[in-house]
Amino acid sequence: TTQKRESAFDFWCRLAFEEGINFWFEEEQLFYSDEHMGMTAGIHLTYNPQADTDISDSTVMTWQYGEYLCVDETIHKDNNFVRPSYPLSHENKIEQGGQHSVFESYGRFQLDDEGRPLTQVRFEQLRNGSKVGQATTNCFALMPGKIFTLSQHPHQPMNDRWQVISVSHHGVQPLADNSGGEGTQLSNSVSFIPGTQEWRPPYRYKPTADGDEVATVVGPPGEEIYVNEYGAVKVHFHWDRRGSADHSASCWVRVAMGWSGNGYGFSAVPRIGTQVLVSYLNGDIDRPIITGCTYDGRNAPPIKFPENKTQTTFRSQTHKGEGFNELRFEDAGGKQEVFLHAQKDMNTRVLHDRTTHVLHDHVEVIENNQQMQVKGARTETIDKDNSETVGQHKKITVGKTLSINVGEVIELRCGASVLRMDNGGHVTINGQEFKFEATGPVQITGKDVDIN
């Protein structure tokens, strides 16, 4: 619970009145009560409109009492982000009520156990004025927190127990030389309600937030990221003079993302030391939510400004280590670029087709090994030249057929040995030594066969 723009007394009163607790003083003692049964009874007053004929100190001279049209139903509704579909709503009403209801859509509770008593107290607060009266007496024992009994009123229902709500005392003591024989006069004005009715101090709405403010994300010593299962973080407000700038500085504060859904969306957790902008739901100072981050003297942007003002970047930082991952866009005229940096591994998963179309050059450098597996067929088309250089060994394994179709000439060369074939049907083998071995017959067929 946050105290804002209110004195310590007003802050205490707001919390007490929210629970329906009233208080009063008797001599040097402070009394609290949340029901009329905790109040002191035993004061007996007599109704006598002829005050001049009564010399006692327990007389009621004037009496007014009325019952008024008032709120007969209260409905309070709220929302718990942990159970967003749960109908977190409570109501209270008198018998046959519902014609004059008060509905508050922001009930200031997150659980049913909080909502039920809060709604009951608010209902009783709104009905404080349903049965109320005023009287003039000369009894100075009356004070808030007291219950008195009236007798000898001509209207019998008035001869009952009544609860004092407020008292204003008046006294006149003439100067001795000018008294004319008049004595000291004492009286008071009393506001009261039926003795069995629960009177609740008026509800005090908490001060609303003035707007957004800046805070710093904090956490336990030695941590860089401190977050709960909902992506919420702890923050230290700059106006906090007493709290430590660690994981005890605040409640868990949720972070608003640019896009969110059930298992999808954008997620980026503000890290410890990040300066964030904090907003408040419905202006409630006890319901902060982080709506953005900002750079400051401790946290510099990932790119240098204004030199790189045309760049848009998304850069992370290695947790408890060096390096980063980055996706960057350069929009300078003639230098447009999309840059992707992976600090370690990069995994791409495409569940259907993938198409890449490069309108100019494509350069790829792999400084270690490459492995490719094609479970179906593979087709490669090169409109012009194809040059392949293998520094050491190359091995081709074909399960069935290997077909090589060349339009003009094919030549295999290994040192001084050459095998050349052209599209005219000429096959030439050059070498220093020829060795033919066969485990079966060898057959040479031709129009002319010359062997030298």
Q: At which residue positions do the language-model features occur?
A:
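Extended, domain-scale alpha-helical bundle/helix-rich regions
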Residues: T1-G195
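Hydrophobic alpha-helical scaffolding
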Residues: T1-R5, T62-L69, N128, A135-N138, ...
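Glycine- and acidic
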Residues: L126-G133, L150, Q197-P202, V218, ...
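Long, distal/terminal scaffolding or interaction modules
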Residues: T428, Q432, T439, T445-K447, ...
